């Protein structure tokens, strides 16, 4: 959330505090080395950087509407989201699967692998275009966000392809680089 990020920076300046924000992989020296080697051209021109988030996610089912638990200010929880009835799937951990609060595994776990894949692309700023297709497949529940999704980011000479698969026999969270 860009607005919340700006508020965080303003608060840090006002209170003279140090704030660190980012994806966890940026603090891991092994990924920094991988990105550096990929960008160096040692293996040739990078054509495709792929990020994979194959992480089994079961159905969240259906939770009945009711009163929020004591201690939860549900109005504050909603923030700028539309007013709606409380049910237990809207809060931890399942909030990721509702468009008003999250964007599925793309922004939950996937953002970490997407960041690494993008890190390997020299001079990547904003993509020229993005195409994405997916859906919530395999079960009926209250969730809204895609559990299966493919995104293609066009950075010109290099494409970033990112996949989310929530219906897999085993977890696989990784990145792949394809060279000319």
Feature names for model-found ranges:
Residues 33, 45, 50-103, 108-180:
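Contiguous beta-strand/loop segments that form the cofactor/metal-binding neighborhood of enzyme cores
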Residues 13, 37-40, 65-68:
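Short, hinge-like loop/turn segments at secondary-structure boundaries
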Residues 27-28, 138:
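Acidic-and-aromatic substrate-binding clefts and catalytic sites of carbohydrate-active enzymes
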Residues 19-22, 38, 49-51, 61:
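Alpha/beta-hydrolase
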Residues 1-27, 41:
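Beta-strand-loop-alpha-helix segment that lines the small-molecule cofactor/substrate pocket
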